[in-house]
Amino acid sequence: MLLLATLARAQQAPQKKDEQAPPEEDEALVPKEYSFNPLQASKELKVGNYYFKQGKYRAASLRFLEATRWDGTLVEAFLRLGEAREKQHDRKGAAEAYAKYLELAPDAKDAADVKKRLAKIKK
């Protein structure tokens, strides 16, 4: 009898649920927004250099790409991105990275060497 009374009361009382509105879109699918952050770019560059030295060129190129997104003027990241993509036999990607490097630093010490690499890739 006591059990029936408890069940009846439970049915009568409205239950409050933790109602959360579902997200309007999957946050994993939302593109990441980048703002100028030279510290994060420097970190990504360091990690990319580590991966490059380990021979993990795909991981390195992803880190160098992240560095260029955080700081679009970080010329070393574009150079290293070109080198990593070249190691992966991604000629188009390497050419794009080298071209951007030369656009940002046309008077760099190694600009002539990068121009030679770029010409070799485009052949």
Where are these regions (language model features)?
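Alpha-helical segment of the N-proximal tetratricopeptide repeat
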Residues: 37-70
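Long, contiguous interaction/recruitment modules in multidomain scaffold/adaptor proteins
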Residues: 1-37
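Helix-start (N-cap) detector for alpha-helical repeat units in TPR-like alpha-solenoids
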Residues: 41, 75-76, 109
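Canonical tetratricopeptide repeat
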Residues: 80, 113-117
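TPR/TPR-like (Sel1-like) alpha-helical repeat modules
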Residues: 89-109, 116
